[in-house]
């Protein structure tokens, strides 16, 4: 799938709000309000991604929005828990040394000495830094199933090669 066709989930709808078709919004973006900067929104309706425009939004114990054409509570309730997505090319371009998490999934992780640790299976945030969850190779000499590797640039993460789909780390394979 090309970047132009790729769909990225940026949030989801919560419960309906009020009687005029407003919905609560759960944003997955770093700055929650920035979800409204992405246009148009794509919402999966009966297995197909359909474009929607936000008519209005506001903060009210979180975020709520009104979609164009959605005017009654009962109709809004059918959108509860549906994902909000945008086309990948709607996301801002990053500099060469910045990455979206989605770009790192599936990349091979190797030590600076060439030992293959596995592939990036997940990433999560901690208070101080992100952590790569690396699913170990089946024949891992150290018997590991997964490794948690802190995403600390230059100290642990030595190189990220987008073309080769490879991350080089300064990490002890036994840990």
Swiss-Prot record:
Provide GO CC annotations from the record. Answer: cytoplasm; ribosome
Q: Which organism is it from?
A: Aliivibrio fischeri (strain ATCC 700601 / ES114)
Q: Which UniProt keywords apply?
A: Chaperone, Cytoplasm, Ribosome biogenesis, rRNA processing
One of the protein's GO biological processes: rRNA processing
What is a single Pfam family found in this protein's UniProt entry?
PRC
Main subcellular location: cytoplasm
Pinpoint the PRC barrel domain residues: 96-175
Provide the function of this protein: An accessory protein needed during the final step in the assembly of 30S ribosomal subunit, possibly for assembly of the head region. Essential for efficient processing of 16S rRNA. May be needed both before and after RbfA during the maturation of 16S rRNA. It has affinity for free ribosomal 30S subunits but not for 70S ribosomes.
Gene encoding the protein? rimM
Please give the Gene Ontology molecular function terms for this protein. ribosome binding
The record's note on its domains: The PRC barrel domain binds ribosomal protein uS19.
List the protein's name: Ribosome maturation factor RimM
């Amino acid at each position: 799938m090309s970047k132009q066709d790729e769909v990225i989930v940026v949030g989801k709808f919560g419960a309906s709000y009020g009687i005029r078709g407003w919905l609560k919004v759960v944003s997955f973006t770093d700055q929650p309000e920035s979800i409204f900067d992405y246009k148009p929104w794509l919402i999966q309706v009966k297995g197909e991604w359909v474009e929607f425009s936000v008519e209005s939004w506001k903060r009210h114990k979180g975020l709520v929005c009104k979609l164009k054409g959605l005017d009654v509570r009962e109709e809004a309730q059918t959108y509860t828990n549906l994902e909000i997505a945008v086309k990948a090319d709607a996301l801002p371009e990053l500099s060469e040394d910045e990455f979206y998490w989605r770009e790192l999934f599936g990349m091979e992780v190797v030590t600076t000495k060439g030992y293959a640790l596995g592939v990036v299976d997940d990433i999560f945030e901690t208070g101080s830094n992100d952590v790569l969850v690396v699913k170990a190779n089946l024949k891992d000499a150290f018997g590991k199933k997964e490794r948690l590797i802190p995403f600390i640039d230059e100290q642990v993460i030595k190189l990220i090669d987008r073309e080769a789909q490879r991350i080089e780390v300064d990490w002890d394979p036994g840990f």
